[in-house]
Amino acid sequence: MRVLVAGANGQIGQHLVRLLTEAGHKVRALVRSEDQVPNMRNLGGEPIVADLEAEVSYTAAGCDAVIFSAGGGPGSGAEKKETIDRQGAVKLIKAAREHGANRYLMVSAMGAADPESGPEKMQPYLRAKARADQVLKESGLAYTIVRPGSLTNETGTGKVEAAPSLGRRGEIPREDVARALLATLTAENTHGKTFELLSGDTPIDRAITSL
């Protein structure tokens, strides 16, 4: 499968480019600057430089799937959350439809189901994620929305807990989020579903196929 990864130079994105390549997929790695190109090549991706705040439709041409893992980043203001986390995601939803990339995975966030209940400083981010998620649900694409808990840089354990609603908060290593995305990509049972993701005791493949 040829997969466009948005946010490829992010911490989840770098794990994802490597894992997808190792699994035999062709990865088009969307990055925002030329100085990120060598790293993408080292990870096995085919880099493409584009700004999610500008025109990006062409980046999905020839792809079978899109994984949106981009974001405004920690410390960015509400405006950046709107232009990247919402508008950037929506642009690539439209691009996926235009170019026939029928599979779309969204890296959302735990708390996006009810942004107003989150911490005040997180609400602009959660609102942007929620709005992008809703557009994806209405897109007609074979979508899956993945909502991880608080992200850490610990080494992944390969074990998670996944369910439409877990009823608790918690953490998960970014590496395990990337592994869960890899498993979800080809799991037809996840089409049209939204699920939360935390560290747990179930091997990732089993957790995903059990959704």
Where are these regions (language model features)?
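Structural motif
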Residues: 2, 64-65, 103
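Active-site beta-alpha turn of Rossmann-fold NAD(P)-dependent dehydrogenases/reductases
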Residues: 70, 105-108, 149, 198
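NAD(P)H-binding glycine-rich loop region in Rossmannoid oxidoreductase-like domains
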Residues: 29-98, 185-189
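Conserved SDR Rossmann-fold cofactor-binding beta-strand/turn motif
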Residues: 31, 147-152
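Conserved Rossmann-fold NAD(P)-dependent oxidoreductase catalytic core, especially the SDR/UDP-sugar
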Residues: 6, 26-30, 34, 73-76, ...
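Non-catalytic, hydrophobic alpha-helical segments
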Residues: 12, 66, 136, 146, ...
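Active-site-lining helix/loop region of Rossmann-like oxidoreductase modules
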Residues: 153-211
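N-terminal Rossmann NAD(P)H-binding glycine-rich loop of SDR-like oxidoreductase domains
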Residues: 1-25
